[in-house]
């Protein structure tokens, strides 16, 4: 039995299964878990189908989503795999997703070929910035005709290319999740091949720690005799004491130097991604900064007011609006730590948006906010969440 030793130094990669309902996403997820468990028992517990299928509910930015998280390891990597059973859950996770995927396995049943939701999922993956797709041609055990398999593969490749993915070179692996789950050696091998392809082809993500420093400001206060302190959770990067920073968003950008870093009342030399800390700012007055701005490495982030977004609007049952809205609707957009009013323009041909819909839109904010493509936000009305979205393109 091949034994891989557990190393914390392994790269961590977030992936997921996407594709049309009933094409076998959850069965394949369970099969991956089982095949890797059998291959590396020390590294992987087996997560059975029914555990993934009854995906637990979780809340992301006020929206309830049923989603299953499965962890497993290959020899090279540690994976966190998300599987959203329902089509609506999948869409909600893509748009609001805390689980940002570094790559996804597009599951297409060889018996059906690409269907409506296959197309919708690929389009959405492109819009929300999933960087890489590869294909599992599932249920291949049920198709005897090689020509049909080749046709389906061609169709899937064309679909990927049409949405800006690498349709020519993306790995397309013929698998049978069900047969692999039953332990059929021929089909177990195909799932091993699929995971080798995931290892080789899904690019390793840049870790949060290696990105330029960014901390959203949650609170501002004055320490007598020392100056102004801003607190928040470091979103990415790291910052050493005496570094120059820029404060961006809402008002004109200003530069200052961080003369002290404090965490849980202890002095620190550095602030790292994921940590809650206070930054002491040289020569900055209490009234110069406010919640909703961000502290960044100079020159790495600019404030914007106009952007395109992909948005999910809550249904009435989820606590959303009870009626549709139209262009020129002016709700609040909650970015990181603050609400800013924005004016919505719906795409041509869309008259109105109903609760429960997902849509594209253009937004004009009344104040500039530090943002980049892929940034998530909530849409709020009178303090309650009515929608959630991601910035897909910055316009101004």
Curated annotation (Swiss-Prot):
Protein's cellular compartments: Cytoplasm
Top-level taxon: Bacteria
InterPro entries from the UniProt entry: EF-Tu_GTP-bd, EF-Tu_GTPase, EFTu-like_2, EFTU_2, G_TR_CS, P-loop_NTPase, Small_GTP-bd, T_Tr_GTP-bd_dom
GO cellular component: cytosol
Domain tr-type G: 10-206
EC number: 3.6.5.3
Binding locations of GTP: 19-26, 83-87, 138-141
Pfam family, one: GTP_EFTU_D3
Principal location listed in the UniProt entry: cytoplasm
Region of interest: G5: 176-178
Region (G3): 83-86
Enzyme class, broadest EC rank: hydrolase
Residues involved in Mg(2+) binding: 26
GO molecular function: GTP binding; GTPase activity; translation elongation factor activity
Region annotation (G1) ranges: 19-26
Catalytic activity: GTP + H2O = GDP + phosphate + H(+)
Record key words, sorted: Cytoplasm, Elongation factor, GTP-binding, Hydrolase, Magnesium, Metal-binding, Nucleotide-binding, Protein biosynthesis
Biological role stated in the UniProt entry: GTP hydrolase that promotes the GTP-dependent binding of aminoacyl-tRNA to the A-site of ribosomes during protein biosynthesis.
Entry similarity comment: Belongs to the TRAFAC class translation factor GTPase superfamily. Classic translation factor GTPase family. EF-Tu/EF-1A subfamily.
This protein's name: Elongation factor Tu
Organism: Beutenbergia cavernae (strain ATCC BAA-8 / DSM 12333 / CCUG 43141 / JCM 11478 / NBRC 16432 / NCIMB 13614 / HKI 0122)
Primary gene name: tuf
